């Protein structure tokens, strides 16, 4: 019996009056995941397009694959590179992940398979916990409200998993996605009604609730007992010269062979997926352009001002682009159509605000070298206000024509 036939056979149990009526949202989510919705427009449609919400969300999900697969490889590569340089660390590792990796692969940093299996052993459990726990909350709220499960959770789950450090405990992953889905989205009415990005809301909760597992030098590499600073931390402590002196070139940072979150290190891989989003017009080019212009503008201004005590003032814009979570946030987080500005002019302002804020936080805030998460959440709060003033300005301009 095929999947379609099986789903059709049990459908009556989930319909109104069936014994599993309250779980219709779960059935519908599974059915929609495998097949397109069976309902069609009966009357004349005012807008006709080849893409619906499901296809749009699946496209975004697929566009994260370059960053996802490279992130898995790089997570394993960074760990195996440390094991090759410090064999005593390899001998001290323990736990179920280490046992699983040892049974499927080795620890050779020159082996594509070894690196990928090592990284997958960290990313896939994080993604699985995110998907299962977050999916539970989605189905629960959909069942209570008696509506369908929205496909947007496919995007939220993978984005949340990709912005976490590889060493994060799985129970914290469950707490973070629960906070992001429930507090960041569902309490406001669900998809389309939230004003904060759910994935970033969950990460912000973890950052402030469990800073030891979300920041510092010991969380970015999947090796117990090892501390390795990110490129941004090195720059914050000693400028770009400190980054280069530690053997990290701009090309290393661009390709992504550096310490960092599971899916944020490779600007190249992120840009591949991001360009697809721009070409398909799922992501707004105005927001992306605004983020870039805001970041470049303030970076150049701070370069001109300079500082004898803060080396971050001298950080060039092209380094801001490839370190931290800037690229990932610009393409996948800032362009969230729900929490971003809606008007065309507002999108430029919204993007520029993010670009300016991320540089400002990175350069001026001594306690927080990364700024993309806070910059986007800050802009999310102002998005409705930005759109309000843009609309009011347009109304005044149109009224002035008739005076």
From Swiss-Prot:
The keyword Transport belongs to this UniProt entry's keyword annotation: yes
Positions modified as FMN phosphoryl threonine? 230
Subcellular localization, as worded in the UniProt entry: Cell inner membrane
What are the entry keywords? Cell inner membrane, Cell membrane, Flavoprotein, FMN, Ion transport, Membrane, NAD, Phosphoprotein, Sodium, Sodium transport, Translocase, Transmembrane, Transmembrane helix, Transport, Ubiquinone
Q: Which reaction does it catalyse?
A: a ubiquinone + n Na(+)(in) + NADH + H(+) = a ubiquinol + n Na(+)(out) + NAD(+)
Q: Which residues cross the membrane?
A: 56-76, 121-141, 163-183, 220-240, 265-285, 287-307, 312-332, 348-368, 371-391
What are its E.C. numbers?
7.2.1.1
Q: Please cite one Gene Ontology biological process associated with this protein.
A: respiratory electron transport chain
Q: What's its top-level EC category? A: translocase
One GO molecular-function annotation for this sequence? Answer: oxidoreductase activity, acting on NAD(P)H, quinone or similar compound as acceptor
Q: How does this protein lie in the membrane? A: Multi-pass membrane protein
Q: Which family does it belong to?
A: Belongs to the NqrB/RnfD family.
Subunit field text: Composed of six subunits; NqrA, NqrB, NqrC, NqrD, NqrE and NqrF.
Protein name (record): Na(+)-translocating NADH-quinone reductase subunit B
Species in which this protein is naturally found: Ectopseudomonas mendocina (strain ymp) (Pseudomonas mendocina)
